[in-house]
Amino acid sequence: ESRGLGDVYKRQHLHGDHCFGLLGLISTFGLLGRTADLHIHSPEGLEELFAPMLAFFCKTLTYKVLFHEFETKEPALIYDDRSVTVTTIPLKHRIPCCGFLFEEKQRPNHIIRDMVDFYKVPVYELNRIKNGADFVTPEGEVIANSRLTRPSAPARKYAYCSDTMYLPKIAGQIKGVDLLFHESTFAQTEQARAKETYHTTAAQAAQLALDAEVKQLVIGHFSARYEDESVLLNEAAAIFPQTILAKENLCIDVDGGTAHEK
């Protein structure tokens, strides 16, 4: 079966703010004439919750909705295609919850056309050369792969962690990711409240980013008590300077480390 991430939706946990909008999205897709299957990955219980609502409100859907449930205690590979994998990150919240680690697969090297033409490399050899093979001429001369190709861009990694209390142990799984989104519900002055509600402070999110040696941190999921969210940004940036405050319609250049609004 061939599908892309655009046909796959992932629910971390079954609190209402993370799944109430799903029924409307499914219905809207139907109104827009969608025909491709929709795959929804979630902790156990979402299909049981949504099956009666889909049967009642979405009787005439033009596509299939397929549920895939995963365990939340250990990391699990839940998606794999030729370009990317998605693995769960076990988190700790009031109910079973996971984050997600998105990992691009390394693309083949880029062919240097002038060199390939110069050595008269046959077309049928190009895939092997893209994947690192040297080329041997009819005369037996070995042409190093480095003379025929240039490296493709490094594969990127993105980790999404919310909702959760501070979990230092996940630093190993998200080590060195290009971009980490981590919830920062409270300021450090509310650390006790954060622990009580199984959430994280901005300082704790920044410490995790520092320990995991990530390249960029985006903090979000802020408590409504903070009218000025810069207090959370300042708290995190004091520990991990490469911190960005999540905003609606924010676009982040993972490679360049910049952010702008649409």
What are these regions (language model features)?
Residues E1-Y9:
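Single conserved hydrophobic/aromatic residue that forms the stacking wall/gate
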Residues Y9-H18, H93, H221:
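Histidine-centered divalent metal-coordination motifs
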Residues G21-T28, E227-E235:
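Metal-dependent catalytic neighborhoods of phosphoester/phosphodiester hydrolases
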Residues T35-H39, R156-Y158:
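Short active-site oxyanion
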Residues D37-G45, V218-G220:
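Short internal beta-strands
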Residues F57-F70:
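A glycine-rich helix N-cap at a beta->alpha junction
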Residues E71-I219, D228-I239, D255-K262:
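Metal-dependent phosphodiesterase/nuclease catalytic metal-binding core
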Residues P241-N249:
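Conserved phosphate-binding/catalytic loops in two-lobed NTP-binding clefts
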